[in-house]
Regions:
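Extended boundary segments
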Residues: 1-47, 119-120
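Glycine- and charge-enriched low-complexity intrinsically disordered segments
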Residues: 103-124
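Short, basic/aromatic beta-hairpin or loop at an interaction surface
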Residues: 43-58
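Residues that flank catalytic or metal-binding motifs in active/ligand-binding sites
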Residues: 38, 73, 94
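Short alpha-helix capping/helix-loop boundary micro-motifs
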Residues: 60-67
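Short, compositionally biased
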Residues: 84-107
Length: 124
């Protein structure tokens, strides 16, 4: 079954450089094996990366054994929905590319919360 975005449309690519996604296919695709629900396409910020590291999830350090290049500020990445929600609750949520964010995210986060942090192409 095709993964859809939060609007019910085809899921757009989040990032191919760095190559992101649970399946490392550039999209925030998911299935039942994705226990972390890596479904939110974010644009990482320095504040968010610091928050994530201080919360025990270091996204900045490369981990080649997991095919993980490390995330830098300004890069797009498929983030776990619960991690985004935690950052949101702590006023550190990164911007979100809604068209590339999987509709499964809505099981954890409301569309209104995502829209508050929506990144639009005109802002790039």
């Amino acid at each position: 079954m095709e993964n859809k975005n939060v609007f019910g449309d085809s899921l757009m690519i989040c990032s191919e450089n760095p190559l992101t996604g649970y399946f490392r296919d550039g999209c925030c695709n998911t299935d039942d094996t994705d226990l972390g629900l890596h479904t939110v396409c974010i644009i990482a910020s320095t504040d968010f990366l610091i928050f994530s590291t201080e919360s025990g999830n270091d996204l900045s350090t490369p981990r080649p054994e997991f095919n993980f290049p490390g995330v830098k500020s300004g890069e797009k990445w498929c983030l776990c929905a619960l991690r985004w929600k935690e950052a949101y609750q702590n006023n550190c949520a990164p911007m979100v590319v809604l068209e590339a964010t999987n509709e499964k995210t809505l099981e954890v986060v409301t569309l209104d919360e995502l829209i508050e942090h929506a990144h639009y192409k005109a802002e790039i």
